Amino acid sequence: MPAPSLAGGTSHDRPRSRPALSPSRAGDYKQCPLLYRFRAIDRIPETPTRAQVRGTVVHAALEALFALPTGQRVPDRAAELVRPAWERVSADSPDAAELIPDEDLDGFLSEVGKLVQTYYSLEDPTRFDAQACEVYVETELENGVRLRGFVDRIDVAPTGEVRVVDYKTGKAPREFTESKALFQMKFYALVLLRTRKIVPAQLKLIYLASGSILTYTPDHDELVRFERTLSAIWKAILAAGATGDFRPKPGKLCDWCDHKALCPSFGGTPPPYPGWPDLRDAEVVAAKENT
């Protein structure tokens, strides 16, 4: 999955579209229902961090790398893609440009360059072609749950096997964050199962900061069970969405939350609930569950 979107703007100038479930939003709800509300319904802007901007630039550089002919995907050429990738990201996101001042830019680009070069210790991009990079995927399950997200890379072997690849610019995860990363990859595997009618042969997480790889082989029955898990999460979200009852769930990650000032657990008051963008979603799901 790509690094988080760095788009700016206020919650008032963003259109309220029909909600869908992505790996990030599902993770938000599991972590803290109120965080889900702030991000998915109120859409309160968050200031990007240096690490997020760095991850976005790395993703942009690797996407540009795979757009080159196979023989040109060498380390020196990849290094040349770093600055143009930054220029695209900073042009699209004024917040990102402000976060990295001119006097710090060379050091920042050096950080990005090291991560891009680490990639070559894990894969040789001159030996294969990706079928697609930064792929938007979307499907709707039978019970009305809409799934969507972006896949960093999809590879298809000459024999037809599909591999789903995700770049991580942080270090290899511990047990908790490893399960979170695999949740994301199973999500994409399920979308491919429903859209392409295939089970990916491999889910591959590439950790560029630590120079390590995590692979996983899903099976059909496992993805069907995972589909039920997502349906249960969505049912809980819809129930909260109908009433506005998104409760905070304090934990260790609260120290890194942008919304502590609005959280009742820390003495704050959330903004007035704007209502679920499309209450018909709840009605459709309820009708299908009762048939």
Feature map (PLM): residue ranges:
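C-terminal, charged and often intrinsically disordered regions of DNA end-processing helicases
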Residues: M1-Q52, L279-T291
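Short acidic (Asp/Glu) and glycine-rich catalytic loops that position anionic groups and cofactors
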Residues: L34-D42, H59-L62, A91-D92, V165-T169, ...
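Mg2+/Mn2+-dependent nuclease catalytic core
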Residues: V135-L230
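A non-catalytic, helix-rich entry segment at domain boundaries
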Residues: A61-C133
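Short, polar/flexible loop-turn hinges at active-site or ligand-entry regions and domain interfaces
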Residues: D42-A51, A67-R73, R174-E175, G244-D245
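Regular secondary-structure segments
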Residues: H59-T70, W234-L238, A242
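Hydrophobic (often cysteine-bearing) scaffold residues that line and stabilize catalytic clefts
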Residues: R50, R54, F108, A181-Q184, ...
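Metal-dependent nuclease catalytic regions and adjoining charged, substrate-binding loops involved
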Residues: S5, T10, D76, T159, ...
